[in-house]
Structures are given as C-alpha cells and as structure tokens.
A protein has these predicted regions:
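Extracellular lectin-like interaction modules
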Residues: 1-203
C-alpha cells in the first residue's frame, strides 16, 4: 500500500507530460514509466516522483549507440536529500571524445558553473536537464551549483557505453574500498580513476 505520485517531464505511455498521476504498489511490485518517443529530448529526465513510503527508482536507456556498439545504461537514483552542490567528474575512455555529463536541477533559478580548461556558467529551472561534452584539453570537470543538482555521467571504453549517477564531493565514501575484477574482464583493460587534492599527490 505505497502511494506514489509521478509528474512525467514528457509524455509516457498512458499519461501526458506535466500532469500528475498516482499509483499504488504493494511490497515487491514495480511500475515502469516509458517515454512515448525514442528521441533523447523527449525522455524522462527531470520527472518528479514522490511516495509516502520508501521506494527504489531505476533509470535506464535501453539503446545508446556509438558505432559499432550499442548498450543499455542505467542506475538507481537517490533522493534529493542525498545529492549536492559540488561534483568532480573524470573523463573515461570512450572513443572520439564521446564522454558526457548531464546536470538536472531540482529548484528554479539554479546557477551551475562548470570548470574544465575554461569555465562556463548557466541557469537551470526545476526539472531542466543540460548535457555537456568534456572540453578537448581537459580530462576532468569540476561542477558547482547554488542549489542541489543531479549529476549523471555517460562514459565507457572505446564504443562500450556505461552510465551512472555521480555522488557529490561531500559523499566521501570510506578510506578503504575493495572491488573484484570480473572473469570476462581479465582479457580487457581495467581502469581505476582516483581523484584527490593536489596536496595529497606526494603522500
């Protein structure tokens, strides 16, 4: 008996854009909101979801292409109280500089500044999303905002795509992190990107 209200950014199957509707789900049940258009401009970034009990939300795009590859990307998003106003994003290994970062505002009059080899500032309204390629001379992007924003990175290796929600800088994680390389990856290159302050580099 979880009540969930959805305001889709664009038209979805069975519901029009910007018109709230409510669904009821029991434990273990799921609901899929699917955009009526395959064009990225009309997908669902910036949609609003509220619930009276805890829920999990996964966002996906089932077919992104960089010739000759095609992949599904997605991640489980976090609630607004877990996002932040400061991010660092490191460029991956996609071919032809196809790495991108997407910023979504949660409040009106959100001022966002991107720092790479140069800086760029812009305003976003609530639910508005803007995407950026990395500047050709920079492998990192430092992002600040005056109000909480979501940051989603599209990256990968060669033409193999992946995507994930980027945690804000205040989400410092832990001092020790373990991970296991998959069996299928043993014949492929494995890359681990780590960022820190300049003062820590010589330690």
């Amino acid at each position: 008996s979880t009540s969930i209200t959805i305001i889709p950014k664009n038209d979805i199957i069975g519901h029009k854009a910007q018109i709230p509707f409510t669904i009821m789900l029991n434990k273990g049940q799921s609901y899929s909101a699917v955009a009526t258009s395959q064009l990225g401009l009309y997908h669902l970034a910036g949609s609003q979801v509220t619930a009276d009990k805890p829920i999990a939300i996964t966002v996906t795009d089932d077919l992104l292409e960089i010739d000759p590859c095609a992949d599904l990307i997605g991640d489980q998003i976090v609630p607004i109280d877990k996002i932040g106003v400061e991010y660092i994003v490191i460029k991956g290994q996609l071919s032809d500089n196809n790495d991108q970062v997407y910023i979504t505002a949660t409040e009106n009059n959100t001022l966002v500044t991107l720092y790479g080899s140069t800086s760029n500032s812009f305003n976003l309204s609530k639910g508005e999303t803007k995407g950026f390629y990395y500047q050709s001379t920079s492998n990192t992007m430092y992002i600040t905002a005056n109000k909480p924003i979501y940051c989603f990175q599209l990256t990968g290796m060669g033409c193999e795509l992946g995507g994930a929600i980027v945690p804000p800088i205040v989400c410092t994680g832990s001092n020790k992190v373990a991970y296991r390389r998959g069996i299928a990856a043993k014949t492929n290159q494995l890359i681990l990107n780590v960022f820190t302050t300049t003062s820590n580099i010589s330690l």
